[in-house]
Amino acid sequence: MTFRFDNSYARDLEGFYVDWPAAPVPAPRLLRLNRPLAEELGLDPDLLEREGAEIFSGRRLPEGAHPLAQAYAGHQFGGFSPQLGDGRALLIGEITDRAGRRRDLQLKGSGRTPFSRGADGKAALGPVLREYLVGEAMHGLGIPTTRALAAVATGEPLLRQEGERPGAILTRVAASHIRVGTFQFFAARSDIDRVRRLADYAIARHYPELASAPEPYLAFYEAVAEAQAQLVARWMLVGFIHGVMNTDNMTISGETIDYGPCAFMEGYDPGTVFSSIDLQGRYAYGNQPYILAWNLARLGEALLPLLDADAERATDKANSVLETVGARYQGHWLAGMRAKLGLAGAEEGDARLAEDLLEAMRNQRADWTLTFRRLAEAVTDEGTLRPLFRDPAALEAWLPRWRARLAPDAAERMRATNPIYIARNHRVEEALAAAHAGDLAPFDRLLEALADPFTERADRELFALPAPEGFDDSYRTFCGT
């Protein structure tokens, strides 16, 4: 099968990676192929259904593939690790999709690499299917994200903390896998030439319009800050908690990447944490905008030598961008909140209107997704909204203020903005448990709903319901991939 690889990272950035083969797997089996994505990439889904097990397990890579493990560093929970890198993933190449966009293809769970740090480099079935589901859920919500092209069972049992688990490999598609941590890797070694080469490559690939800017590296820093501020605002608007916002998990492209311990919040609480390793709540839902700025500061540090030859002037230039991050984020968040609330135009009191609703939701632990969805019905009838609040009168004073700001077509706009279906934790776990037992039908049904999250259907009612009382209080997620 022809993939038409054009591997610019391997060609232009020698020394930024290690050539490495995928580990052998005993009995690969294609579990799921993302046929719409395959077509978007200009690939033949029917042919991939037949040959995908061999290709996406790394057993028989297509002609032109160049498997490599990328080097990067990163701050993990605030502590700097000078060498991380692809410890269980291989970039196999780049292709141009039907829209003319360059896309990375990466095998995740393909075995040990020189960056594995003692781990086996493999991925278990559950985490692979989880990333597939959540990535497609984010895509359905219109949020920039990496996506899964395929999931392959390897036929190899893996020993994990919870016992023996079947092995699997995810084929991930991304605009690129360049991270803040990629810049940090070379900056930590004072290799300014490679920091510059990486910046030039990232500009050419993601922000080509900046190449002719008076100060292209400063413009690049600003563009990444803008892309990430918009991304995190969109996470917050759907109640998404990434769970591990380390600098090696922040892309230069502005895509969401690495769905290890992520989850969607149900009852609204800014302190919500699901990740089993986030013991201090560093990456709690409400902290994500602050971590956004913290991570961008680390990128700024790596770029300082490119911003100006004079250290003081370079710092001032970096700070001039950093000082805008809060306003950038708030602007995107407020614009999104106005859309969620169906407001007409923009008025000064809109932020207070939104914050007062959130305060009531927090006090009542109201479900994030259903509250905004049922507000569309509350334009004319609040009968389905009130039961979401323990005190039915909690919004008594707020509703008239909100209705006074509504656009004429508010209900229609709100239904197109506020999803009815998200990847609720209990439904994800049910689908994964069934998959472990050999039944992928629940996975497929959930995936179908998540691909069309704004269209409410009677036969999908179960996917809209919150978890049983107390489920999320004890629910924990893990870095499985």
Curated annotation (Swiss-Prot):
One Pfam family cited in the UniProt record for this chain: SelO
GO molecular function annotation: AMPylase activity; ATP binding; magnesium ion binding
Reaction catalysed by this enzyme: L-seryl-[protein] + ATP = 3-O-(5'-adenylyl)-L-seryl-[protein] + diphosphate; L-threonyl-[protein] + ATP = 3-O-(5'-adenylyl)-L-threonyl-[protein] + diphosphate; L-tyrosyl-[protein] + ATP = O-(5'-adenylyl)-L-tyrosyl-[protein] + diphosphate; L-histidyl-[protein] + UTP = N(tele)-(5'-uridylyl)-L-histidyl-[protein] + diphosphate
EC number: 2.7.7.-, 2.7.7.108
EC class (word): transferase
Family (UniProt): Belongs to the SELO family.
Protein name: Protein nucleotidyltransferase YdiU
Organism whose genome encodes this protein: Cereibacter sphaeroides (strain KD131 / KCTC 12085) (Rhodobacter sphaeroides)
Name of the encoding gene: ydiU
